Amino acid sequence: MSNLDNPGIYYQERFFANDGVPDTGRELIAEYRQLITQFRNFIRDFSTGGFGMIYRDQLKRNYFSHEYRLEINLNHLKNFDEDIEMKLRKFPGKVLPALEEAAKIVADEITTPRPKGEEKLHDIQVTLTLDEYPTSLRQVKSAQVSQVVKISGIIVAAAQVRSKATKVTLQCRQCKHTIPDVSIKPGLEGFALPRTCAAPQQGQMQRCPIDPYIMLPDKCECVDYQTLKLQENPEDVPHGEMPRHLQLFTERYLTDKVVPGNRVTIVGVYSIKKLIQKKGGDKSLQGIRTPYLRVLGIHMETSGPGRTNFTTFTPEEERMFKTLAQRKDAYELIAKSIAPSIYGSADIKKSIACLLFGGARKKLPDGITRRGDINVLLLGDPGTAKSQLLKFVEQVSPIGVYTSGKGSSAAGLTASVIRDPQSRSFIMEGGAMVLADGGVVCIDEFDKMREDDRVAIHEAMEQQTISIAKAGITTTLNSRCSVLAAANSVYGRWDESRGDDNIDFMPTILSRFDMIYIVKDTHDVLKDATLAKHVIEVHVNASAAKERDIAGVPKTATTDSDGVMTMFDTDGFLTIEFLKKFVTYARLNCGPRLTPQASEKLVNHYVKMRNPVVNADAFKSGKKAHNSAIPITVRQLEAIVRIAESIAKMELQQFATDKHVEEALRLFRVSTIEAAATGNLAGVEGFTSTADQEALNRIEVQMKKRFAIGTHVSEHLIVQDFVARQHYRESLVKKVIDNLVRRGDLQQKMQRKMLYRVR
């Protein structure tokens, strides 16, 4: 049992504690002490050229702040002594305890004398950072077991914080023999109690039984630990494959640092643990081990919305971004580079460009935030390239998640609570809108979703949070993402005569979209000929590219011979890689605000749209002029502000000027206002014209006068009477009937043929 106290054996990360190698322990002790001395010198003396010793000062500052931790950059350690840095990377199980012991010694030196009541010296936790590109989760193999690795991904689940013993005291139940301060291996390996009593058995009346030891809870030293679930980044997952996961083990000051949905970069020890088996499991699995990562450092990607791998940009790339932003046609060029293989749809592409860049997120003095992300809905006929636009946005967005309406549930889009198979406690897993925090969620077949699932994303689209209150877990997750949705008509193709009957959406979900486009497949000889030529040309070029690949002709490089990123492709459009980096750069470094002149112009337009001009003759006669203007609400006003800010962001401007507001108003008119003016959004908050609203009120008053309470009338006859004799639109009459039925004033009977007035 003496080996239990041997630090050399305790920190070895192998399948078994004893490798069969004879070891006196003297060499290990001497090496251990030498490592402590080297690390002690590093912490005390390392400097980057200034007057201060960065790690000594950091340790002193943290210790007096009651944060007993020290963060060390491995590149600094490499500059100080490359040999011990290599040992720490290759054998962290052996070397890390020496580093923490050295930190504790230095802390004792620099904090003596300590205040009264704080004389006890606390253990120091050492966390690591690494200045190198993270490894993909798929590239971490068995060769890296027990070595330091750096990987990135998304946290999708987090268990609750628990306690784990680091030192235990064992006592024999029979003879009360005690083994104090038995060290427990860090990580998820656990600890096996000795099978036999270590006390001398001579002279005892009764021998101690097998498995005699128990732990004394009041004499154990414990630390906090938490297990997390890491999923590889969506952009790293090959098409057609499932994203891979890895369990993370955090302890002490690294617990409670992240929540599901956070993008993180992890430095840790790639470790293995025994495979958990049920009773009577397969005996051939005894040698199988499950990988997990013992975390030594967590870096959250909090550089802002639009987080991606492009967190740093070269001076040459920044020069290219500013050159593009200074062009007069920058806005037009970016819009044309959105899915260039799709013909036409210029305004839709401009709106998608605005969605990619987004407006400026604002936090008000009272703590309320105003979203800067833009939501766009595409409604219309099949075959109008809506899904292709969504697929392109998924590629070019810094963080893009694509999902289909029929295959999406409320839990899959927002968050779910599941039971942890190990601890049997409930843990939370983030859905698509949580994982896309800082990016774009593309929802295809939006009309095929169940209504209950659509309601679940109301909060995420406006407040940009997801509140969870399930299974004893009450929390709020961030979902700061834009939504690009595509839907078809209820009747397959768009029917002009049916107006708003083409869509089956609640007004609450439609009002959360900043721009709504009705995409129709109209018949036009000239347009059809141009479109057909474009489609054929795309297919011919694709076939030629495939033949070049077969012949071994190299593809067009995304970087030139000097390694500088290419700005334009062969057709004169921006390359996908450049556009993706430019979107990231603009979202990180630009947050435009409206100028006073632009604000005043927007206020004037808002007032005009809310209160249309009354002509002089009608004013003199005391009557209002007949108008069909759409009185917009404050929610649509905020949408116009976001659109103007996004256009300014494409030009890397700090302020949105008059021209940006004019273009934002134009985009809003050709999208939402045009869709509402044609009656396709009638009944939606703020999208019913004044004339239609007055007609609806008149029809309701006349209908209630036509038949008394308790009488029956044919629905067909009353609709025909209002349409033929009083010349109202059939859609308005049916809408009034639907409203009265919904309010409970009318009931439909006899297979919806008769109407019965209840009140």
From Swiss-Prot:
Q: Where does ADP bind?
A: R370
Q: Which reaction does it catalyse?
A: ATP + H2O = ADP + phosphate + H(+)
Q: Which organism is it from?
A: Caenorhabditis elegans
Q: What does this protein do?
A: Acts as a component of the MCM2-7 complex (MCM complex) which is the replicative helicase essential for 'once per cell cycle' DNA replication initiation and elongation in eukaryotic cells. Core component of CDC45-MCM-GINS (CMG) helicase, the molecular machine that unwinds template DNA during replication, and around which the replisome is built.
Q: What is its EC number?
A: 3.6.4.12
Transmembrane stretches, by residue range? none
In its keyword annotation, does this UniProt entry include Cell membrane? Answer: no
Q: What is this protein called?
A: DNA replication licensing factor mcm-5
Q: Which cellular compartments is it found in?
A: Nucleus; Cytoplasm, Cytosol
Say yes or no: keyword DNA-binding present: yes
Ordered alphabetically, the record's keywords are: ATP-binding, Cell cycle, Cytoplasm, DNA replication, DNA-binding, Helicase, Hydrolase, Nucleotide-binding, Nucleus
Q: Which domain of life is it from?
A: Eukaryota
Assigned protein family: Belongs to the MCM family.
State the span of motif (Arginine finger): 511-514
Q: Name one GO molecular function term.
A: ATP binding
User: Which residues does the UniProt record annotate as the domain MCM?
Assistant: 330-536
SMART domains in UniProt? MCM (SM00350)
This protein's assembly is summarised as: Component of the mcm2-7 complex. The complex forms a toroidal hexameric ring with the proposed subunit order mcm2-mcm6-mcm4-mcm7-mcm3-mcm5 (By simililarity).
Gene Ontology annotations for the cellular component aspect, listed alphabetically: cytosol; MCM complex; nucleus
Please state the protein's primary subcellular location.
Answer: nucleus
